[in-house]
């Protein structure tokens, strides 16, 4: 799963064959962004802001078994009161986390550029700067 606001600058982080369920993340001493707390390589908590954590970068891989579970669990979560206000990744990481063992896969700060604003897009692609 890839978020639409990402520019991949290191194509090696994208793998053709991938057999674990994991999120790409950047090891951080401190972040104000969405991040993971990880124990023994497995994500145990997702939150906004943290110390000694892994900053989420918006790319995840899902093995076949977890992909099927995720399809059912997303539907179930979204049908519950308040479910439509949830982010999809909260389903396997928060609301149904007992169903999953989601690992973290390290990437580097310069592997991905996240484009959050029109100003950031214009800085990367001058054709938008009109």
Give the role of each language-model region.
Residues 1-7:
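Short beta-strand-to-loop acidic/aromatic patch adjacent to the donor-nucleotide binding site
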Residues 5, 22, 32-33, 116, ...:
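Acidic side chains
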Residues 55-130:
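Conserved alpha/beta core of the MobA/IspD/sugar-nucleotide pyrophosphorylase nucleotidyltransferase superfamily
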């Amino acid at each position: 799963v890839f978020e639409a606001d990402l520019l991949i600058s290191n194509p090696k982080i994208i793998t053709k064959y991938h057999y674990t369920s994991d999120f790409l993340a950047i090891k951080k001493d401190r972040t104000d962004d969405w991040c993971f707390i990880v124990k023994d390589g497995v994500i145990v908590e997702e939150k906004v802001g943290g110390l000694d954590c892994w900053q989420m970068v918006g790319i995840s891989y899902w093995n076949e078994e977890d992909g099927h579970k995720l399809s059912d669990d997303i539907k179930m979560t979204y049908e519950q009161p308040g479910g439509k206000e949830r982010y999809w990744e909260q389903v396997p990481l928060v609301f149904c986390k007992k169903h999953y063992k989601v690992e973290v896969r390290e990437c580097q700060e310069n592997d991905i550029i996240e484009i959050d604003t029109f100003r950031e897009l214009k800085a990367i692609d001058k054709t938008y700067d009109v």
